[in-house]
């Protein structure tokens, strides 16, 4: 089935990445049928999504309601963005993360299996499955082990990947696991609507705009400037990668399971991110306070996305400055006006 005729289900479509993805999806394929499953009745994305998007408020932990809803939607393609994603919170509430991320995914798979038809599933995984990997940049062919992930969030995604890879031995599922590194930027007017986000860049931008203190967690890592180093990817580049993965899977029907790293291949320290933001907001000065490290944060995460470039023809094009400037526009022009 061609992309333009597909029925697409987006789980977590009212969240940051999910809503940006729908925006990019409809720009490229305006005639696809899009349905969303989410639990966030108050998401600002509800005010922005076009009327053609059908939104269903269903908790993935309610298997009966989820099964009924998916039977009604009868999707051909599923993009699974729904998850709890805070590393810090996962160390405090590990069972909650296993429930939402692992059990929720299992319930989704049960519901999709009931359709008794082939399904293409694109799973939002994470760099956290690698933990503090000793090989940098982190290659896609690194053998995942349960002990590799350094926090319950990463473990929940690792276990989900194992389940998905096992299920692709059946004829019903084709699965692509897309391992995100740090996502930033916006697909304006869509962006990170989460008022309680723990991500560095939105909190940094809000600190500048609201003239409040920004907390830097850890300046004593074994890195070039003592702060964590992360690989960042613009959310629009990330969405483009999902659409390229879909097109690639359509052209390769014999593929059962594949995983791709999605990042820029370049590491930026927290101090470098702060300095880039400082240049955007100059002459405004950041109020900064250094705190102790957060539990579960590896010192360095940088990706090798050679396979994504080779197979998907994926090449991120948006710089760190572009990520910060787009997200600044989102918070200035859209976030506080909704």
From Swiss-Prot:
InterPro entries: Epimerase_deHydtase (IPR001509), NAD(P)-bd_dom_sf (IPR036291), UDP_G4E (IPR005886). One of its GO terms (molecular function) is UDP-glucose 4-epimerase activity. One of its GO terms (biological process) is galactose catabolic process via UDP-galactose, Leloir pathway. Gene3D superfamilies: NAD(P)-binding Rossmann-like Domain, UDP-galactose 4-epimerase, domain 1. Substrate binds at residues 126, 153, 182, 198-199, 215-217, 230, 294-297. The active site is at 153 (proton acceptor). Keywords: Carbohydrate metabolism, Galactose metabolism, Isomerase, NAD. The keyword Membrane does not apply. The keyword Phosphoprotein does not apply. Its EC number is 5.1.3.2. Pathway: Carbohydrate metabolism; galactose metabolism. It catalyses: UDP-alpha-D-glucose = UDP-alpha-D-galactose. NAD(+) binds at residues 16-17, 37-42, 59-60, 81-85, 126, 153, 157, 181. Pfam families: Epimerase. Its cofactor is NAD(+). Transmembrane segments: none annotated. Coiled coil: none annotated. Homodimer. Involved in the metabolism of galactose. Catalyzes the conversion of UDP-galactose (UDP-Gal) to UDP-glucose (UDP-Glc) through a mechanism involving the transient reduction of NAD. Belongs to the NAD(P)-dependent epimerase/dehydratase family. This is UDP-glucose 4-epimerase. The gene is galE.
């Amino acid at each position: 089935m061609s992309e333009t005729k597909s029925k697409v289900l987006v789980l977590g479509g009212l969240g940051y990445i999910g809503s940006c993805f729908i925006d990019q999806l409809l720009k490229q394929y305006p005639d696809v049928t899009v349905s969303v499953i989410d639990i966030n009745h108050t998401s600002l994305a509800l005010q922005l999504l076009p009327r053609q998007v059908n939104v269903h408020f269903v908790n993935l932990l309610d298997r009966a309601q989820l099964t009924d809803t998916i039977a009604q939607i009868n999707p051909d393609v599923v993009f699974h963005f729904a998850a709890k994603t805070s590393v810090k919170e996962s160390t405090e509430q590990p069972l909650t993360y296993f429930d939402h991320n692992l059990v929720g995914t299992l319930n989704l798979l049960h519901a999709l299996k009931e359709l008794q038809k082939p399904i293409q599933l694109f799973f939002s995984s994470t760099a956290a499955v690698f933990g503090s990997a000793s090989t940098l940049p982190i290659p896609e062919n690194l053998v995942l082990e349960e002990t590799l992930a350094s926090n319950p969030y990463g473990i929940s995604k690792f276990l989900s990947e194992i389940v998905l890879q096992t299920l692709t031995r059946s004829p019903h599922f084709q699965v692509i696991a897309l391992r995100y590194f740090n996502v930033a930027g916006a697909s304006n007017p869509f962006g990170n609507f989460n008022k309680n986000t723990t991500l560095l860049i939105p909190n940094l931008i809000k600190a500048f705009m609201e003239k409040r203190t920004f907390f830097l967690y850890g300046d004593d890592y074994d890195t070039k400037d003592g702060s964590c180093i992360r690989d960042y990817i613009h959310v629009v580049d990330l969405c483009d990668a999902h659409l390229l993965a879909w097109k690639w899977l359509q052209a390769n029907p014999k593929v059962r399971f594949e995983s791709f790293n999605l990042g820029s291949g370049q590491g930026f320290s927290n101090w470098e991110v702060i300095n880039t933001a400082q240049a955007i907001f100059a002459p405004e000065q950041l109020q900064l306070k250094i705190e102790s490290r957060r539990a579960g944060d590896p010192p360095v995460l940088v990706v090798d996305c050679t396979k994504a470039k080779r197979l998907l023809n994926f090449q991120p094009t948006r710089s760190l400055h572009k990520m910060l400037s787009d997200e600044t526009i989102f918070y200035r022009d859209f976030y506080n006006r909704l």
